[in-house]
Amino acid sequence: MDHNARFVAQTVVAFVMILPIFAQPSPRSHALDEDGALALLEQTLKHDGVYAHRISLNCVTYGTEETTGAYFQFVLRENHNAKCGGDPETSPVVDRYRVYRKSGKIEWLERVEDNWQPYNPAKIR
């Protein structure tokens, strides 16, 4: 690989590595509906691997707990069935999230302090 190609490859790799540090949810031209908010949440959790070492995302279900003019609040629950295991009569809460309609900002309910925190995958894992 010649010097210029190596430099370009290193620059691209460096850009890809630091982009998530500066990436913030962009203001949306239109507000999210419930399906869009849930899709954003699922995509974000999957991309960040928040539950990769805790539970398969195939073994969770999402439910809408609250809808306001500002946000949708979702609950993430364990899915107990033959494939995922567990008592099928229960579906314990894993976490709760709010997705804001206009900004796409995500918040997570920190259960010990019982307050809403900005989404930070490192704190949730």
Predicted features along the sequence, with ranges:
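Exposed beta-strand-loop-beta-strand "reactive/processing" segments of non-cytosolic proteins
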Residues: 56-100
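Short, solvent-exposed loop/turn elements at domain surfaces
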Residues: 49-50, 82-86, 107-108
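Bacterial N-terminal signal peptides that target proteins for export
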Residues: 2-12
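Bacterial N-terminal signal peptides
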Residues: 10-20
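Eukaryotic scaffold repeat domains enriched in small/polar residues
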Residues: 45-50, 67-68, 72, 76, ...
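Short, non-transmembrane alpha-helical segments in secretory-pathway proteins
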Residues: 26-61
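C-terminal partner/receptor-binding element of secreted or periplasmic proteins
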Residues: 105-125
